[in-house]
Amino acid sequence: MTDTRQLFLERVRQALRMGARPGASQEIEPRGNIGYQGAGTDPAARFCQQFTAAGGQAHPVANRAIAIDKVLELVQAFDAQRILLGSGTFIDALGLRERLKLAGRHVDSADAARDTLFAADVGVSGVDYLVAETGSLVFLARPSEPRSLSLLPPVHIAIASVEQIIPDLFDFFDLASVREDGTPPSCISIITGPSKTGDIELKLVTGVHGPGEIHVILIAE
């Protein structure tokens, strides 16, 4: 055996012995959240910018009274007769059901029969979070606001407060591991703009698998 070959084999043996030792591998310093973008100095403006870029329509308003007026304005603009309305502490406090009925609209709850859900012209809901980085709406599944509320009507109107904005998706996953009752959500929906598909002849089509229009009314207070 030549000296060169013997030296090579000895180095291989040493490397194998070192590799088998616990803790012999070099530790890599943590690099934090790679790709974290955040929201900059104005999370609300950042969200509206990104949401609009994704094809949504943002409507910043000063208070809840103006938010209600904006919902009625949009419903009137779409000539929507049947409204699918979510529920929850935030939405219920707005008194939208009564205002919509006074405007002559038929209002259904999310637990309505299947045929009723498909007949809705507009879906109105709250949100759990808004992600400034991507302009996304986040919904945690619950009986009062199921997926059908934001999926079936051709137009979706979401009402939110600026306090629900989080900077980045990394922040969302830190927050959404459990619900208030201590259990993880059965489903998490992250919606960025209206429904889009481009798998037919490579042409972008909107509104095939969900709402063709999505509006966010963002309350400053």
What are these language model-derived features?
Residues M1-E221:
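The feature marks the mature, well-folded catalytic cores of soluble enzymes
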